[in-house]
């Protein structure tokens, strides 16, 4: 059943809620098998990434909002039979209340736009089975540091402005930069609930289809992919990630009230 859903999504154009999620892994590499067991593929009209933070809860980007979701867990390759693969239906979604709902339908970036609070919680109809290939990851407890080495992951296009999508999960190594770097790089708002990450020399980035996926810095989940420039991976155009340390209280409150 889930393979039919996935093929349908790909047949109509495997795109994410573009540009706020201009998030594809560019300049990356094939992730080591089962090295990202919290990675989730969120399937609706688009393909987005997500992160398993509790057996019953996935966090993703608010601009990935839709009315029906399915999630794939424990997958390295989206199309091959894999021993740890699981499929779940989402029965409730909780976009952050301060995210601008206009951007849930309109995904074009304009100068001055403020995409703050770009995160959403998805409640699974049945908890995930925790195995060697499916694991939860803890929320951050400390601020990420500028210069931290980070890893982002996803299944989306590996070349800027081209629809070349890998079957296998891709990883890319980038660094946390000061928000001032992103303020200079973008005409959109860069706020204190966002993280700036990438490589100023370009060539490494997240892009179309990775939105909502994890950003791990020094092994700690610190962000989820939000938006970047078009095309991605350009020189002096680092990407923007939702800064999770700013939202841990809200996340825990939603999970507690709706479990």
Curated annotation (Swiss-Prot):
Q: Which reaction does it catalyse?
A: Preferential cleavage of Arg-|-Xaa bonds in small molecule substrates. Highly selective action to release kallidin (lysyl-bradykinin) from kininogen involves hydrolysis of Met-|-Xaa or Leu-|-Xaa
**According to its UniProt record, in which tissues is this protein expressed?**
Kidney and submandibular gland.
EC number assigned by the record: 3.4.21.35
For this record, an example GO cellular component is:
extracellular space
Q: Which UniProt keywords apply?
A: Disulfide bond, Glycoprotein, Hydrolase, Protease, Serine protease, Signal, Zymogen
* InterPro entries, sorted: Peptidase_S1_PA, Peptidase_S1_PA_chymotrypsin, Peptidase_S1A, Trypsin_dom, TRYPSIN_HIS, TRYPSIN_SER
Q: Does this UniProt record's set of keywords contain Signal? A: yes
Give a GO molecular function annotation for the protein: serine-type endopeptidase activity
Give the enzyme class: hydrolase
One matching Pfam family: Trypsin
Gene3D superfamilies xrefs: Trypsin-like serine proteases
Prosegment location in residue numbers: 19-24
Q: Which domain of life is it from?
A: Eukaryota
Provide the residues annotated with a glycan attachment (glycosylation). Answer: 91, 106
- Biological processes per GO annotation: regulation of systemic arterial blood pressure; zymogen activation
Q: Where is the Peptidase S1 domain?
A: 25-256
Keyword Disulfide bond belongs to the record: yes
User: Known SMART domains for this protein?
Assistant: Tryp_SPc
* Catalytic-site annotation from UniProt: 63, 118, 211
**Got any disulfides in this one, which pairs?**
31-171, 48-64, 150-217, 182-196, 207-232
Q: Where is the signal peptide?
A: 1-18
Family according to the record = Belongs to the peptidase S1 family. Kallikrein subfamily.
- Task performed by this protein: Glandular kallikreins cleave Met-Lys and Arg-Ser bonds in kininogen to release Lys-bradykinin.
- Write the protein's name: Glandular kallikrein-12, submandibular/renal
Q: Which organism is it from?
A: Rattus norvegicus (Rat)
């Amino acid at each position: 059943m889930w393979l039919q859903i996935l093929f349908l999504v790909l047949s109509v154009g495997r795109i994410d809620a573009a540009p706020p999620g201009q998030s594809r892994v560019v300049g990356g590499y094939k992730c080591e098998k089962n090295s990202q067991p919290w990675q989730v593929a969120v399937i609706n009209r688009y393909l987005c990434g997500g992160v398993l933070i509790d057996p019953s809860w996935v966090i993703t980007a608010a601009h990935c909002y839709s009315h029906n979701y399915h999630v794939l867990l424990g997958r390295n390759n989206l199309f091959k039979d894999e021993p740890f693969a699981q499929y779940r239906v989402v029965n409730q979604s909780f976009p952050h209340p301060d995210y601008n709902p206009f951007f849930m339908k309109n995904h074009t970036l304009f100068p001055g736009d403020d995409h703050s609070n770009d995160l959403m919680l998805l409640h699974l109809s049945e908890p995930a089975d925790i195995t060697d290939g499916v694991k939860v990851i803890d929320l951050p407890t400390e601020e990420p540091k500028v210069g931290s080495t980070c890893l982002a992951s996803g299944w989306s296009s590996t070349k800027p402005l081209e629809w070349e999508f890998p079957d296998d999960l891709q990883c890319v190594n980038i660094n946390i930069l000061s928000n001032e770097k992103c303020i200079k790089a973008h005409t959109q708002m860069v706020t204190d609930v966002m993280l700036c990450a990438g490589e100023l020399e370009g060539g490494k980035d997240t892009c179309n289809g990775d939105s909502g996926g994890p950003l791990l810095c020094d092994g700690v989940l610190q962000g989820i992919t939000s938006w970047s420039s078009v095309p991605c991976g350009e020189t002096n155009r680092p990407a923007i990630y939702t800064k999770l340390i700013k939202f841990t209280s809200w996340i825990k409150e939603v999970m507690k009230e709706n479990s």
